[in-house]
Amino acid sequence: MSKVKSITRESWILSTFPEWGSWLNEEIEQEQVAPGTFAMWWLGCTGIWLKSEGGANVCVDFWCGTGKQSHGNPFMKQGHQMQRMAGVKKLQPNLRTTPFVLDPFAIRQIDAVLATHDHNDHIDVNVAAAVMQNCADDVPFIGPKTCVDLWIGWGVPKERCIVVKPGDVVKVKDIEIHALDAFDRTALITLPADQKAAGVLPDGMDDRAVNYLFKTPGGTLYHSGDSHYSNYYAKHGNEHQIDVALGSYGENPRGITDKMTSADILRMGEALNAKVVIPFHHDIWSNFQADPQEIRVLWEMKKDRLKYGFKPFIWQVGGKFTWPLDKDNFEYHYPRGFDDCFTIEPDLPFKSFL
């Protein structure tokens, strides 16, 4: 049979998806984290893989889903949090713009799965299934109550789940995970479609969302989930030593406040007394597309006058950041290769060919 007749949509998908195959899985497994450091990889959106010098592997908010895929229904889901926020009716054109850089079903070495909150782009049934099927049978699933309710509903045994709220501490090998207050006001209006938010005092944030501080022997990482800007970042900065902070950044559409702005990211870094602040989430949704260089430009304008003690870092999805080795870098670039050029004799017609 000819190739053009044997190839199907399904064979095409299986041969090209996930786009990075197991490349990043292999890179993470092979990484030997040096003493006095920690390594992390950006998985897209707010997904992070963190690896410590003791070999602890944890993933946070690893999501393997997609956004809008069809114009079929021109209207937003009734009761959606964005509809509540802005009184809109039209479909939100949020298409996923980031490739899938990690294969959940190729994960073998993992010590904990974490989620900051239960929004669809921060917790994933495919990740849960892959870990349950292919990894050790004692890997815990850690998150606030709403996340644990989801995991249990998907079939994760209750005894594998750990509910955390601000103030709780969980130890995973040599990583101490501190659950802290979250400031995700969008989470408070994520309600059942038939439930009204107008005129009703929101229920507590603690069951819905948490921020995390990961204390490793090589440094600390602050993961803010989908939190908006809050004065309480300064409280967290007073109470904890924070090396690297991650903040959800994006260009909010008209009538919407769901992501931190460039100014908010700088305020967050300053309030937390962080050494490095890294924006994320701006990569994933087409309608929240934002240029992180804006953060760096604003930082350059303010850093001397306000005596900033932190630097911004512009990352790329799938890229690695190692603390403290990368603390003075401003931007990530994927490995360029060809470092072994001229280790063998080139095969060219003549030397001046190129």
From Swiss-Prot:
* Cofactor dependency: a divalent metal cation
Q: What pathway does the annotation place this protein in?
A: Cofactor degradation; L-ascorbate degradation; D-xylulose 5-phosphate from L-ascorbate: step 1/4
Q: Does the keyword Phosphoprotein apply?
A: no
Pfam families named among the record's database cross-references: Lactamase_B_2
Q: Which InterPro entries match?
A: L-ascorbate_6P_UlaG, Metallo-B-lactamas, RibonucZ/Hydroxyglut_hydro, UlaG-like_MBL-fold, UPF0173_UPF0282_UlaG_hydrolase
Going by the UniProt record, its keywords in alphabetical order are: Cytoplasm, Hydrolase
Annotated Gene Ontology cellular components are: cytoplasm
Which SUPFAM superfamilies does the UniProt entry name for this protein? Metallo-hydrolase/oxidoreductase (SSF56281)
Q: What class of enzyme is it?
A: hydrolase
EC number of the protein: 3.1.1.-
- Signal peptide start-end: none
The reactions it catalyses are:
L-ascorbate 6-phosphate + H2O = 3-dehydro-L-gulonate 6-phosphate
NCBIfam families named among the record's database cross-references: PRK11709.1
**Family, per entry:** Belongs to the UlaG family.
So what does this one do?
Probably catalyzes the hydrolysis of L-ascorbate-6-P into 3-keto-L-gulonate-6-P. Is essential for L-ascorbate utilization under anaerobic conditions.
Protein name (record): Probable L-ascorbate-6-phosphate lactonase UlaG
The scientific name of the source species is Escherichia coli O127:H6 (strain E2348/69 / EPEC)
| Lineage of producing organism | Bacteria, Pseudomonadati, Pseudomonadota, Gammaproteobacteria, Enterobacterales
